[in-house]
Regions:
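Conserved ABC ATPase signature
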Residues: 134-138, 142
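Helix-to-loop junction immediately C-terminal to a conserved catalytic motif
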Residues: 48
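Catalytic Walker B motif of ABC-type/P-loop ATPase nucleotide-binding domains
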Residues: 159-163
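Conserved ABC transporter NBD signature motif
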Residues: 56-64, 73
């Protein structure tokens, strides 16, 4: 259980997230949605212990994460940032191994169990086929899978992703979201991710948090959050909301008029 209580945080003494309180249950698949600048990434950074709050607390199973040792937190919660710079020609399997650091001994030597875990993760993420390749040679979708593999190598129960499908085609997006859903449904991982694609958020996430101007505008199931009134208010655009005939999940469709 994650409890966020009266959290305010930001940069240069300016609050980007303002007095947020919400609970996240174990095993949930949470999608954080909202316009650019709403505070989604800032909230994830605070949740991951990377950004100290101006006020408020974040508790993980009753313990304030900012009072936990970093190595202990890294064994409980992992975070994959958006657009992580990949400027050095790492071999893919070596790059994934970096995720094992919290579990390694004092000298940071990889042991047999670390190599076995990496093999298991590469199988799961379908990255073994390019394990020996230079990471700079990979496509956008392949790189994202490698980043996910490195994040999974931390072997945490809670995983936070910042826009894991940004700049990817629909096929790569679907592949990654299916991967996250398997992690959630079959492996019991708690997934928290920011998403710009409202329809992907509604399709794959168990619950959504709609942010606006640093606050939580609404939260709940996809059907509860993705209603046309709230979406039009937050995004300042006209939409209609239909139902996917296969999944029965809401589909948000922007409406454009030649008269405007």
């Amino acid at each position: 259980m994650i409890q966020i209580k009266n959290l305010s945080c930001g940069y240069n003494k300016i609050a980007v997230v303002d007095n947020i309180s919400i609970d996240i249950s174990e095993g949930a698949f949470i999608g954080i949605i909202g316009k650019n600048g709403a505070g989604k990434t800032t909230l994830l950074k605070a949740l991951s212990g990377l950004l100290k709050p101006y006020s408020g607390n974040i508790f993980l199973n009753g313990t304030d994460i900012y009072k936990m040792k970093k190595n202990l937190l890294a064994k409980k919660l992992s975070f994959m940032p958006q657009n992580m710079p990949l400027d050095f020609p790492f071999i893919v399997k070596d790059f994934i191994m970096f995720g094992r650091f919290p579990h390694m001994n004092f000298f940071k030597y990889a042991l047999k169990q670390d190599y076995e875990k990496i093999e298991e993760i590469m199988d799961f993420t379908e990255t073994k086929e390019f394990a020996e390749r230079n990471i700079l040679e990979l496509s956008g979708g392949e790189r994202q899978k490698v980043l996910i593999a490195q994040t999974l190598a931390q072997e945490t129960d809670i995983i936070a992703f910042d826009e894991p499908t940004s700049h990817l085609d629909i096929g790569s997006q679907s592949s990654i979201f299916r991967l996250l859903r398997i992690l959630n449904k079959k492996h019991g991982k708690t997934i928290i991710t920011t998403i710009h694609d409202l329809n992907a958020a509604g399709e794959f996430c168990s619950n959504l948090i709609l942010m606006d101007k640093g606050t939580i505008f609404s939260s709940g199931t996809a059907t509860e959050v993705l209603n046309y009134k709230d979406i039009e208010t937050v995004y300042n655009t006209t939409v209609v909301v239909k139902t996917n005939p296969v999944s029965n999940k809401p589909v948000v469709i922007p409406v454009f008029s030649d008269n405007k």
